[in-house]
Amino acid sequence: MKTVTEFQNKNILVLGIAKSGYAAATLLQKLGANVIVNDGKPLADNVLAAELQAKGMDVVCGGHPLELLERNISLVVKNPGIPYSNPILVAAKEKEIPIVTEVELAYRISKAPFVGITGSNGKTTTTMLTFEMLKEGQKHPVIAGNIGTVACEVAQDAKENEVVVTELSSFQLMGVESFQPKIAAFLNLFEAHLDYHGTKKEYGLAKANVFKNQTENDYSVINADDADVMELSADTKGQKILFSTTKEIEDGACIKDNALYFKGEKVVEVSDIVLPGQHNLENILAAMSIAKLLGTSNEAITVVLKRFTGVKHRLEYVTTINNRKFYNDSKATNMLATEKALSAFTQPIVLLAGGLDRGNEFDDLIPYFKNVKAIVTFGQTAPKLVRAAEKAGLDIIESVDTLDEAVVKAYAHSKEDDVVLLSPACASWDQFKTFEERGDIFIQAVHKLI
């Protein structure tokens, strides 16, 4: 960890606890700050808050009183999930108190350079691929951010010869000031999180903060097939490394003659890649670009791509039962993700879909039903998905109450060489706490079939 004195004896407000807030508060106390911790949950229900209080911190729970800002606060470190429209953040902004997220702290104390990966879809897969490629290439990566350990915990122990690989959300990137990744990657942009950002433009601008402080000594890895990403990255001062699945890129990454190329050099044959899905080729090109920029060999990259089958809950291969392959894509919480999952297979598909009703219809899925032979729906959106399936002319359409029932029905409708795919196209919160819980229940139900 760098020797950092800027926080000594400063009054710093950590807003929202959870994992990142807890880690930030602990770090700031270690750096000599006077830490005030504030969380909306009552102290009686807040184990982490009680632990911080036991460490001698001033803890205020059960709301976000504006009076906290009267304590000569020099910095607010906010939980990424707390919107900037929250009155205490509005007031802090009016008082010109800097507001950052935990990843900014991590960067300021780290001896190791950062790789920052953002985008609407594919962040986790790309981050894991990058980590695995760098690890295979003996480049000493550590993983942090939305996956792995909280960034400021990792950064404390990171050495100069290591590299911190971080998955970054728009929420985190809104709160950066000096954060300057050596390599920043912007994968794609789709309309999302409008309840937080208001408009797609504001959402995109938050994502583009990943390039904000880069210089000509840094690299900006950019999806050349995404017009929004190209526009948002136009002003980056980093060296642009473009990647594309649709056109040749001489000074970047592309697909040519059934192989992946980087700066004109063949790296790996497409046939060596076991991860399914056209969309995953974009993720692979981005990860490969980062790995090559950090000196990873083609051999190391190929070894990883021959074994990497995906990230849990993201088009994850589960098992094969009587020549039916089961895939868990519980992370598909919107139609776009399900469209990509359906496009990944040429075999007949039995689709399990449904979940929280956010008011949208599912007609956009109809063109992607061409390989779907049967659909089993569940959750709040089941009737809407049934309507879309009927419009698509599917012969086998069923609705059930639970995911366990859906798995049994899906297996009954499948035949040898079919794919049984959970890709809900909806959030999970109508029946499950998280998409991870939904995916785990699917996997358990599949194994009960054996």
Curated annotation (Swiss-Prot):
Catalytic reaction equation(s) = UDP-N-acetyl-alpha-D-muramoyl-L-alanine + D-glutamate + ATP = UDP-N-acetyl-alpha-D-muramoyl-L-alanyl-D-glutamate + ADP + phosphate + H(+)
InterPro entries linked to this entry = Mur-like_cat_sf, Mur_ligase_C, Mur_ligase_C_dom_sf, Mur_ligase_cen, MurD
Is the keyword Cell cycle assigned to this protein?
yes
Identify one Pfam family in the record. MurD-like_N
Q: What is its main location?
A: cytoplasm
What are the subcellular locations of this protein? Cytoplasm
Per the record, the coiled-coil ranges are none
What keywords appear on the UniProt entry? ATP-binding, Cell cycle, Cell division, Cell shape, Cell wall biogenesis/degradation, Cytoplasm, Ligase, Nucleotide-binding, Peptidoglycan synthesis
Q: Which GO terms describe its biological process?
A: cell division; cell wall organization; peptidoglycan biosynthetic process; regulation of cell shape
* Keyword Nuclease set for record: no
> Per UniProt, what is one GO molecular function of this protein?
UDP-N-acetylmuramoylalanine-D-glutamate ligase activity
Instruction: Point out the signal peptide segment.
Output: none
Q: Which biological pathway? A: Cell wall biogenesis; peptidoglycan biosynthesis
Positions with a binding annotation for ATP:
G119, S120, N121, G122, K123, T124, T125
Question: Which GO terms of the cellular component aspect does the record hold?
Answer: cytoplasm
What EC number(s) does its UniProt record assign? 6.3.2.9
What the protein does?
Answer: Cell wall formation. Catalyzes the addition of glutamate to the nucleotide precursor UDP-N-acetylmuramoyl-L-alanine (UMA).
Belongs to which family? Answer: Belongs to the MurCDEF family.
Which protein are we looking at? UDP-N-acetylmuramoylalanine--D-glutamate ligase
Source species: Bacillus cereus (strain G9842)
Q: What is the lineage of its organism?
A: Bacteria, Bacillati, Bacillota, Bacilli, Bacillales
Gene behind the chain: murD
